[in-house]
């Protein structure tokens, strides 16, 4: 299985998915065509064949369409029988309660994923 890498843009996040189970989504997610952007990520997640997955999500902004596709991808990872341990590291800015709440909502909707919350302060 090949790694999956997308350079970030002003409207799409950095994606760095390694076949060894280290996954990263970082930046802003408001693509013009959310289905076109997230479909390769979801398909890749469905084919992943590792026992431990560590997904770091560090999104400074995500629109509602992106949130729906993220949930779809999380559910695919959660249902992937090859994965025995799914850890989602949810990074959020200290004063961004909405971002924290988004992670908590995702966590409630998944069966097996272990969410770990990481608060950070924006550098001055």
What is each model feature region?
Residues 14-15, 81-89, 113-124:
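Short flexible/disordered coil segments
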């Amino acid at each position: 299985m090949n790694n999956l890498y997308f350079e970030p843009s002003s409207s799409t996040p950095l994606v760095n998915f390694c076949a060894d189970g280290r996954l990263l989504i970082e930046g802003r997610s408001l693509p013009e065509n959310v289905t076109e952007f997230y479909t390769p990520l979801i398909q890749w997640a469905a084919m992943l064949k590792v026992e431990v997955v560590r997904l770091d999500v560090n999104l400074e902004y995500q629109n509602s369409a992106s949130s729906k596709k993220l949930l779809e991808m999380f559910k695919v990872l959660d249902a992937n029988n090859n994965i025995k341990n799914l850890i989602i590291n949810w990074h959020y800015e200290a004063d961004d309660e909405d971002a924290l709440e988004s992670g908590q909502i995702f966590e409630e909707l998944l069966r097996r994923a272990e969410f770990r919350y990481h608060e950070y302060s924006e550098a001055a």
